[in-house]
Amino acid sequence: MKKTLLGAIATSALFAFSGTASYAAECIAPANPGGGWDFTCRQIGKILYDIGAEDSPVQVTNMPGAGGGLAYNHVVTERADDADLIIAASSATTTRLAQNAYAGMTADQVRFVGAIGADPGVIAVAADSEFQSLNDLVDAILAEPGSVAFAGGSAVGGFDHLKPLMVLKEAGFTDIGSVKYIGVDGGADAITQTVGGFTQAMTGDMSEIVSFLENGDIRVIAVLTEERVPGFDDIPTATEQGFPVVAVNWRGLYVPKDISDDQFNAWAGKLQQVADSPEWAQAMADNGLAPFTKVGGDFQSYVDGLVSDIATMSAELGVTQ
């Protein structure tokens, strides 16, 4: 019943938003205009046309509903072989799929074609914290799990909650349910909790903490990227501290599952062209994103691993739907 309802609503949404002649390519933003998924479609779509990767402007269709589930259902059930369709996605997409939030649908029902920018994940402490490094924090948790509480801007089981747990997994820690986490309303509130001494650390995204970092309120003890973030070169990655974790709010696309490998690779190549363009570099600078380029099979492998890890942790936390 739930899937049938989603399908009916998705079909209605498509007709509501598709009253114009179709173009060669369409990008579905699974949200209302103005959000992150809408930004992904409009920026990538515009640049694809501007650099000549697409012969015609990319049509953007907004299809909000069910946290991205409405659009996902539409693609899987109605357009599984549409090679002219791309769909905006982010780390929220993979988290919801891993937690079975899309009415029983799974991540292997589409193909993840690429990500070309991200808001880096961070772990931060108050400026006067006793923890000088990520290793100090991890050692404290290993010695006494209840001694450290994290604050984050997502609910229990959300991506902010999962970031430090990924690090602890790499340290061999398995009792993740014993780690204290307080979900608050956004990164600023999480920082307030930490600076005020109510929690010992906060977990969030780089864009949320920049002003607090510049004011000297906090110290970032790890950025969860493969390499240090340009402009914040003094902040070490978790990887270089011995915990190979990449946890970023990536901006990317998926495509229908049943398109051919050649069609999949063509979209991957076009995304790489966008990633390499000065237009995209400017778009990232204007919107607080850091470079994060994975396309084609490399990105699909990254997503597969991410979904598997999140599914395991979510089951242990009891948040799988």
Regions found by a protein language model. Give the residues of each.
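Bacterial N-terminal signal peptides that target proteins for export
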Residues: M1-I9
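C-terminal segment of classical bacterial N-terminal signal peptides
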Residues: L14-S22
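N-terminal (or domain-start) structured segment
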Residues: Y23-D108, F173-A201, T293-K294, E316-Q321
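Hinge/capping helix and adjacent helix->loop/strand transition within the periplasmic-binding protein
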Residues: D50-G52, H74-L85, L97-D189, R251-A283
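A ligand-binding cleft/hinge motif common to bilobed small-molecule-binding domains
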Residues: S91-A101, L165-G172, Q200-D233, A311
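Periplasmic-binding protein-like
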Residues: A115-V122, A222-K257
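An extracytoplasmic/periplasmic, membrane-proximal ligand-sensing/linker region
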Residues: D261-Q321
